[in-house]
Amino acid sequence: MAAKIRQNDEVIVLTGKDKGKRGKVTQVLPNGKVIVEGVKIITKHEKPVPALGKAGGLVKKEAAIDASNIAIFNPKTNKADRVGFRFEDGKKVRFFKSNNEII
């Protein structure tokens, strides 16, 4: 089954404290969550690992956000958009539902 949201897609957050923020998808997780660059920043406490030369402390990183809370961003309309699938030249392609443009 093809995914509507893929790595390197430009997306916009629809709900939550980061509503309206845009960013690139850095990772798509198999449990229906995605990691978006610059969205849902959390602070993790990491222990030092002297054997690896890793210092401990507070580390800021992106946390996973549910895929239902984001939508793909359409640069032509400058809005969130829905994704559809169709076959062109024997290949399955994704397209924006608002203007039928191939992604």
UniProtKB/Swiss-Prot annotation:
Record flagged with keyword DNA repair: no
InterPro entries, per the entry: KOW (IPR005824), Rib_uL2_dom2 (IPR014722), Ribosomal_uL24 (IPR003256), Ribosomal_uL24_CS (IPR005825), Ribosomal_uL24_KOW (IPR041988), Translation_prot_SH3-like_sf (IPR008991)
GO CC annotations on file: ribonucleoprotein complex; ribosome
Gene Ontology biological process terms from the UniProt entry: translation
Chain's role: One of two assembly initiator proteins, it binds directly to the 5'-end of the 23S rRNA, where it nucleates assembly of the 50S subunit.
Subunit-structure text: Part of the 50S ribosomal subunit.
Family: Belongs to the universal ribosomal protein uL24 family.
Protein name: Large ribosomal subunit protein uL24
